[in-house]
UniProtKB/Swiss-Prot annotation:
N- and O-glycosylated. One of its GO terms (biological process) is lipid transport. A motif (NPXY motif) lies at residues 800-805. Residues 301-340, 341-380, 650-699 form the EGF-like domain. Residues 12-52, 53-93, 94-132, 133-173, 182-220, 221-259, 261-300 form the LDL-receptor class A domain. Interacts (via NPXY motif) with DAB2 (via PID domain); the interaction is impaired by tyrosine phosphorylation of the NPXY motif. Interacts (via NPXY motif) with LDLRAP1 (via PID domain). Interacts with ARRB1. Interacts with SNX17. Interacts with the full-length immature form of PCSK9 (via C-terminus). Interacts with PGRMC1 and TMEM97; the interaction increases LDL internalization. The chain crosses the membrane at residues 766-787. Residues 788-837 are cytoplasmic. PROSITE patterns: ASX_HYDROXYL, EGF_2, EGF_3, EGF_CA, LDLRA_1, LDLRA_2, LDLRB. This is Low-density lipoprotein receptor. The lineage of its organism: Eukaryota, Metazoa, Chordata, Craniata, Vertebrata. It comes from Oryctolagus cuniculus (Rabbit).
Length: 837
């Protein structure tokens, strides 16, 4: 009765979404029957408790002892989610639709891919039994029988698999490039396959060109004195030999190693005199150590755990000599005696998304829109299907994650590289390196030949990276030739260069519009990963060490971590958005031979590899479970994951103000949210113009010059005619180039005035009148000075040792006073050379 009363009293304390343990403790219902016990008595995992649970109508019941419930669309998705695999039992065979081709091994591909000259089925059956292809009048027939548009022939870029569209027999001999005008700079090596790589990568033992030409005709490698030469001829640092890790490809660095770590393990005892004996020889009344340290009389006869538990907070374990304090699972020993709880949540990768620390353990939870997979403990999306969009040089393809089958989204492109999507508007954006343009198209109408719009068509050289700000309606892109990062609205009407640096080579870019930041890779010298505000302010480097050729970059918003691939180090790495907690997810020279781009969804990372011509996936937390997603792809480059959860909704502060576009005349750009006092947005003007004094409207440099001249002209009469308290509206200070232009203009005006006054007849008559008046004035002034000196001799003066000066209103100076509280103070360059001159 007492137990029942206590249980009833405790039951009143539990909420509607809580489960009451048998001992009265309250836990969340989502923790019941999840495979780990949160109740101290284990009642949340009892069989009778789990069998009493009922799944929702649209869920699937796994049955068994735990009777777990999973979303209904997880059944027959090719992934085992139930503990016993019952969700993948009794599934109907996969069927292909009418517009799909069924491969011999069962996979489905678009019929457009059958007999197109490229094997898309894993077994190549889509290219078997194909009739010889016939090219239309607007196409060129390659030597391999495939067809490419006739406009692509002899354009300097090989489009046929065998390069026959650029053979000299058809196109003629091409003139050799003049010195200094080649496609690569003097600090780069020109690969035989066309691309440019760092000159320092030539003959470094690692093929960086697609055709491996950077490693041809190289002298035999010799190792330095501080290096170890592997049996295959490669060199590693000497400290890596016998470090219990295989660093040589042939594992020769771990052959013939002698274990010098003696006296380690629970069955060993090290004497004070240096000998190592087995533990069973301690306290056996025999001298095994030279100094008798194995036979201390007092310690051998004492069980320290019998007195006060040996001072241990939890478990005391008696040894032959002394004792040890042990801690239960989930705790650690902090001072050889006391145990404290381990906060497992300090590891950012301990959980898929959210981590809840508990006494002695932890719990993983998921954000809204995701559900925890009871089998893999991964957070999986519960709503719409996720798609992978990737570029295949001449087209954009779409792949479903649950079937790994793809269709053509946009075909007949020249050299598509960068790609991104706007989920809410169902629109994709891409850049074409050959056309030097950025395009967009509606996904609904994209069935191989969609109508697409030209967004940016000028002032582009190599738009290698592209990112869409889905909250504020902007696109950001990089240009590795110009060394710039730029922004424009999604229609391309308004654009601005945000970042430009000599020698930089920005490549991939990703944005976080909710917090106002962008991140991009730069494989210039030195290589780095940069971070800056979406309005172009506060740019600094996040990663500068252990990085050589950073290519693709992506941001996992759910965990707040950046992931990037390094094509030189053959690795996938990650950091938090502030540059800390760096981790290497995966290193693999085979499957990361030349990674180009990557994407994140749920617990998987997907990447494209140019050399393997494939798409791979792996666990983003551990780097394990590497799978081949798609193969036989022609130059797969950018990859984007399309799902509504990858682009969560946010507030567009530029549209929340009373004035449209935030009151900005040109562009309203989100500002980085560094702290709670950060502005929500700032205004920006097109290249070659400046913000006006109101920090919202724009004006040209010519307007600045005229304003400067007017201010200097109006200032002269103010010295005598203006009241002391009068102030003028502050003007935006001109830049250095503006100052030089203003100086030149004023000098020209001065010269013009001088030329206009030369040779005037009136000047002679005026001079004859002014000179007598001036002489008379000087005589009067001299008489006045003599009279004042005579008066001062008869006046006694009083001197104050500590004079006090009263400040008047003429001394007030207002510096950088802004009329808009949501703007940054303008950064201007001041030159002292003009003052010195």
């Amino acid at each position: 009765l007492l137990a029942a009363a206590a249980g009833a009293a405790a039951g009143d304390k539990c909420g509607r979404n809580e489960f009451q343990c048998r001992n009265g403790k309250c836990i969340s219902y989502k923790w019941v029957c999840d495979g780990s016990s949160e109740c101290q008595d284990g009642s949340d995992e009892w069989e009778q408790t789990c069998m009493s649970l009922t799944c929702k109508s649209d869920d699937f019941s796994c049955g068994g002892r735990l009777n777990r419930c999973i979303p209904g669309h997880w059944k027959c998705d090719g992934q085992q989610d139930c503990e016993d695999g019952s969700d993948e039992l009794g599934c109907a065979p996969k069927t292909c639709s009418q517009d799909e081709f069924r491969c011999a091994e069962g996979a489905c591909i678009s019929r457009l891919f059958a007999c197109d000259g490229e094997p898309d089925c894993p077994d190549g059956s889509d290219e078997a039994s194909c009739a010889p292809s016939t090219c239309g009048p607007a196409h060129f027939r390659c030597n391999s029988s495939s067809c490419v548009p006739a406009l692509w022939a002899c354009d300097g870029e090989p489009d046929c698999d065998d390069g026959s569209d650029e053979w000299p027999a058809r196109c003629g001999a091409r003139p050799s490039p003049q010195p200094g005008r080649g496609p690569c700079s003097r600090h780069e090596f020109h690969c035989g396959s066309g691309e440019c790589v760092h000159a320092s990568w030539r003959c470094d033992g690692d093929a960086d060109c697609r055709d491996g030409s950077d490693e041809r005709d190289c002298a035999a490698a010799t190792c330095r004195p501080d290096e170890f030469q592997c049996s295959d001829g490669t060199c590693i640092h000497g400290s890596r030999q016998c470090d219990q890790q295989q660093d040589c490809g042939d594992m020769s660095d771990e052959v013939g190693c002698v274990n010098v770590t003696l006296c380690e393990g629970p069955d060993k005892f090290k004497c004070h005199s240096g000998e190592c004996i087995s533990l069973d020889k301690v306290c056996n009344s025999a001298r095994d150590c030279q100094d008798w340290s194995d036979e201390p009389i007092k310690e051998c006869a004492t069980n320290e755990c019998m007195r006060g538990n040996g001072g241990c907070s939890h478990t005391c374990f008696d040894l032959r000599i002394g004792h040890e304090c042990h801690c239960p699972k989930g705790y650690r020993l902090v001072d050889q005696r006391r145990c404290e709880d381990i906060n497992e949540c300090e590891d950012p990768d301990i959980c898929s998304q959210l981590c809840v620390n508990l006494a002695g353990s932890y719990k993983c939870e998921c954000r809204a829109g995701f559900q925890l997979d009871p089998h893999s403990q991964a957070c999986k999306a519960v709503d719409s299907i996720a798609y992978l969009f990737f570029t295949n040089r001449h087209e954009v393809r779409k792949m479903t994650l649950d079937r790994s089958e793809y269709t053509s989204l946009i075909a007949n492109l020249k050299n598509v590289v960068a790609l991104d999507a706007e989920v809410a508007s169902n629109r994709i954006y891409w850049s074409d390196l050959s056309q030097r343009k950025i395009y967009s198209a509606q996904i609904d109408g994209a069935h191989g030949f969609p109508a697409y719009d030209t967004v940016i068509s000028s002032d582009l050289q190599a738009p290698d990276g592209l990112a869409v700000d889905w909250i504020h309606g902007h696109i950001y892109w990089t240009d590795s030739v110009l060394g710039t990062v730029s922004v424009a609205d999604t229609r391309g009407f308004r654009r601005k260069t945000l970042f430009r640096q000599e020698g930089s080579k920005p490549r991939a870019i990703v944005v976080d519009p909710a917090h106002g930041f962008m991140y991009w890779t730069d494989w210039g010298v030195p290589a780095k990963i940069e971070k800056g505000g979406l309005n172009g302010v506060d740019v600094y480097s996040l990663v500068t060490e252990d990085i050589q050729w950073p290519n693709g970059i992506t941001l996992d918003l759910s965990s707040g971590r950046l992931y990037w691939v390094d094509s030189k180090l053959h690795s996938i790495s990650s950091i938090d958005v502030n540059g800390g907690n760096r981790k290497t997810v995966l290193e693999d020279e085979q499957r990361l031979a030349h990674p180009f781009s990557l994407a994140i969804f749920e617990d998987k990372v997907f990447w494209t590899d140019v050399i393997n011509e494939a798409i791979f996936s792996a666990n983003r937390l551990t780097g394990s479970d590497v799978h081949l997603v798609a193969e036989n792809l022609l130059s797969p480059e950018d990859i984007v994951l399309f799902h509504n959860l990858t682009q969560p909704r946010g507030v567009n502060w530029c549209e929340k103000t009373a004035l449209p576009n935030g009151g900005c005349q040109y562009l309203c750009l989100p500002a980085p949210q560094i702290n709670s006092h950060s502005p929500k947005f700032t205004c920006a003007c097109p290249d070659g113009t400046l913000l006006a004094a109101d920090m919202r409207s724009c004006r040209t440099e010519a307007d600045v010059i005229l304003s400067t001249q007017r201010a200097s002209t109006a200032a002269r009469p103010q010295l005598t005619g203006s009241p002391a308290g009068t102030t003028q509206e502050p003007l935006t200070e001109p830049t250095l180039s503006t100052l030089e232009t203003a100086t030149t203009s004023q000098q020209a005006l001065h010269n013009a005035d001088g030329r206009g006054s030369e040779g005037t007849p009136r000047s002679v008559g005026a001079l004859s009148v002014v000179l007598p008046i001036a002489l008379l004035g000087l005589l009067c002034l001299g008489a006045l000075v003599l009279w004042k000196n005579w008066r001062l001799r008869s006046v006694h003066s009083i001197n104050f040792d500590n004079p006090v000066y009263q400040k008047t209103t003429e001394d007030e100076v207002h510096i950088c006073r802004s009329q808009d509280g949501y703007t940054y103070p303008s950064r201007q360059m001041v030159s002292l050379e003009d003052d010195v001159a």
